[in-house]
Curated annotation (Swiss-Prot):
Belongs to the PlsX family. The gene is plsX. Its EC number is 2.3.1.274. One of its GO terms (biological process) is phospholipid biosynthetic process. One of its GO terms (molecular function) is phosphate:acyl-[acyl carrier protein] acyltransferase activity. Pfam families: FA_synthesis. This is Phosphate acyltransferase. It comes from the Bacteria. InterPro entries: FA_synthesis, Phospholipid_synth_PlsX-like. Homodimer. Probably interacts with PlsY.
Amino acid sequence: MLKIAIDVMGADNGVTPIVQGVIQALKSRDFNAVIIGDEAQIAPLVPPYLQSRAQIVHCTDYIRMEESASAAAKRTQSSIFKTTELLKNGDVDALVSPGHSGATMSLATLKIGRIKGVSRPAICTTMPNTTDKPSIILDAGANTDCKPEYLVDFAIMGYEYAKNVIGFENPRVGLLSNGEEDNKGNELTKATFKLLKEFSFFKGNVEGRDIFNGSVDVIVCDGFSGNLVLKASEGVASAMSSVLKKDIKSCLCSMFGALFLRGVFKRLKKKMDHSEYGGAPLLGVQKVVIISHGSANARAIECAIYQALNAIESNICSKLSDAFANKPSSAQQ
């Protein structure tokens, strides 16, 4: 049975919602959980009938959000260090962490290692759109300064993830720019465009609106731009929800109308709720690593575990290795 390691320390809302998410996942899917954190806080939350499938690795130290990611390599008793060690040694099949994302990325890259041929690992974030399947955008924050060859690697990884894990038959890849024309963009995107033309999956430049209209399935950009897109999208979704709630409560007619539309609102909320998409895989390392939001609730952790299981079952790391082994030399600078 597959084993998933979950680092429950360092999240914004403490241990409880993280463990609750693990419990919900254990009820729904067949796997064993290895929970890394303070046993005194974790043990009372695990029901007796699940204790045989939930091993606890005691640990009280963790990397605080205000600390530098570079501190993680020296903190051998921290929760993320122990979690990464378990994955490195083959004691677990994947890890999920809502803690310090920089520390997770740093340790995963240093200890687990990159897939041969990958220039830089990238954070791959799922974005809702107007179609039945979500879009993905990468990099969403791992690499703020990029070279064209990094973005080419992101495109290859995004294509393979969209095809093998999300289930697109022929994923369409677009390069985020300030216009659709071939000559639009900055020096980075113009140079990247020339390299990506070698790939049949590349559909050209796309604009920010294309992330949400389903015209492409994979959006490639540097980590600085990707993180701005991600945070702006979260902000817009939150603002729209607040405005909608305020307007519904403003008069009796609106409240009655909302009652008739509650099924629509429920489906919309589920589609737009980032918790439903779990976490973000760190693509390009040799094993499955899922980075969750620091404010993740129980549902987000539950879905992040499902992400990890789906990634393992799809054999994504092996698929990425094969893709980079066959990467055309003309797509490299």
